[in-house]
Amino acid sequence: MNLAIGPMTAIVPTLFGIPIDFLLFAAILLGVALFHHHTLRVALIGLAVIVAYKLLVTGFKSGPGFNGLVGHMRQEWVMLTNLFLLLVGFGLLSRHFEKSRIPAVLPRILPHDWKGAFWLLVIVFVLSSFLDNIAAALIGGAMAHTLFRAKVHIGYLAAIVAASNAGGSGSVVGDTTTTMMWIDGVSPLDVLHAYAGAGVALLVCGIPAAIQQQRHSPILKHEHEYVHVDWPRVGIVVFILAAAIAVNVIINVLFPESSDSFPFIGASVASAVLVTAVVRRPDWEIVPEAIKGSIFLLSLVLCATLMPVERLPGASWQTALGLGFVSAVFDNIPLTALALKQGGYDWGALAYAVGFGGSMIWFGSSAGVALSNSYPEAKSVVLWLRHGWHVTVAYVVGFSALMIIAGWYPNAPHKTGIRAAAIVDTRAMALDRDVNLTHVAA
């Protein structure tokens, strides 16, 4: 074990050259991946261990001991509160959309052959651009259950998850990872080009998956009875999204100095949900479960904010590509938090990588876990990889297309002080590599 010190940094114990912080963080993510029925407990225990380690050994960047912890929470509370309110609020928004009965109308437009299965994936892709990707995947799974007489191929389930993650990758309201970027100050336009890769990936995995499904169980064209769309609920969905976007634009354009002082975006969504409750009652019954899921994700995000990101590999397209494969095994939420803290990424490329990359294994994304709860047969890594092979191929092809079409253009730091901090951190990392002040037995 080595103990190294860099300028303006706390002591950073390492094991085999890797900071202990990262080993603890990796252990948490591995525990989440292995113990799917105890994810909240694993995340909270892991957070407690990392906080205790920081308190007793390394201290925080804002200082040692409890004062350092309080200082760190003062820096992060706005981001965490925003994320919590958006996760719960978008969960209620998704239920409004489902109850609008639009999902029951959409299958009417589908062709009778394999192209119908493909266009269903396109619908999921589009829904995910403005709904939470979890909701889009569940809606797609429900429509597939009806259209294919409950005989849904595992390869097609993988494609539904991939379509939902691809559709959310270029939209700041379509995926938790891109929403985190938005909250952190990244412009929505800086993630939009993720669709250059996501669109190609949808074609590459969607067509083989649709053919798989048609051979497994042909599409059943229903002559549905007349479905009455609840347009007031549709209006509520539009109003909530518009409120979030408008408040974010106003704060970041007119009052950028105040953006870190209050959770404006989250508060706008919560207010819009409450105001529109007089028009249609929200599905309050989902709130307890949404809060539980939000606490789990916030625990992982908070763990990520405690990591010494100055010791991570520099941001590059190779790193982003690798993070996509890592996100297939480890939750992409904390990976995104690490990248945001580090800075210097092409956010569109990163959004595509950690979003679509999580589709390669069923537990690599929240959408995959949610859909697999409805289709337990999908909870097999071997079967998912065997029948969903096209998702992995699509990820690589899509990323390549993104690099060819849009290129790699790292965004300038989106927060004041990040540039200077990055310079200091780089110098600290260089010094830490060259100088070990103390050597103790591992």
Regions found by a protein language model. Give the residues of each.
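Low-complexity, proline/glycine-enriched hydrophobic segments characteristic of transmembrane helices
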Residues: M1-M8, F60-G71, L312-P313, W408-A442
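Hydrophobic transmembrane alpha-helices of multi-pass solute/ion transporters
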Residues: P7-W114, L254-G314
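Membrane-interfacial loop-to-helix junctions in multi-pass transporters
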Residues: F16-F22, M79-L83, I109-V122, F148-A158, ...
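Short helix-coil transition sites and intra-membrane helix breaks within transmembrane domains
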Residues: H36-T39, L93-R101, L127-I139, G167-D175, ...
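Alpha-helical transmembrane segments
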Residues: E76-G89, D190-G206, F264-I265, W347-M360
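Juxtamembrane and boundary regions of transmembrane helices in multi-pass small-molecule transporters
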Residues: L93, K99-I102, A150-I154, A158, ...
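Hydrophobic transmembrane alpha-helices that form the pore/transport pathway of multi-pass ion
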Residues: G116-S169, M180-D184, A337-Y352, E377-S380, ...
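Transmembrane helical segments that form the transport core of multi-pass membrane transport proteins
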Residues: I240-Y345, A422-H439
